[in-house]
Amino acid sequence: MQKARIRLTGTDFNKVEMVCDKIREIAERTGVNLAGPIPLPTKRLVVPIRKSPDGEGTATWDRWQMRVHKRLIDIDADERALRQLMRIQVPKDIGIEIVLES
């Protein structure tokens, strides 16, 4: 039987977990095997910016950061389960990637 590997990425931790919960509910309803969600390392993108625009004065810095949270889910590729997966309402700032493996 084929397996579907689902990779979720997003900057909002709560939205990523919400989509994981929806996938888990679909797996329980359809009775397919589910492995995960496996938390992958969170990527931190840090951008230091000087507060002073003209370069005069003391060097004080603002540090802006964006965190990218990732989850990995393996699920059996049952036709009924995959059709329901395609219908999930995913927020637009969450990336979802589905790869079928044999």
Curated annotation (Swiss-Prot):
GO cellular component: small ribosomal subunit
InterPro entries the record matches: Ribosomal_uS10 (IPR001848), Ribosomal_uS10_CS (IPR018268), Ribosomal_uS10_dom (IPR027486), Ribosomal_uS10_dom_sf (IPR036838), Ribosomal_uS10_euk/arc (IPR005729)
Keywords from the named record: Ribonucleoprotein, Ribosomal protein
Keyword Ribosomal protein: yes
Organism superkingdom: Archaea
GO MF assignments: structural constituent of ribosome; tRNA binding
Keyword Membrane annotated: no
GO terms for biological process, alphabetical: translation
SMART domains assigned: Ribosomal_S10
Family affiliation: Belongs to the universal ribosomal protein uS10 family.
NCBIfam families registered for this protein in UniProt: uS10_euk_arch
Role noted for this protein: Involved in the binding of tRNA to the ribosomes.
Subunit structure and binding partners: Part of the 30S ribosomal subunit.
Name of the molecule in the record: Small ribosomal subunit protein uS10
Protein species of origin: Methanosphaerula palustris (strain ATCC BAA-1556 / DSM 19958 / E1-9c)
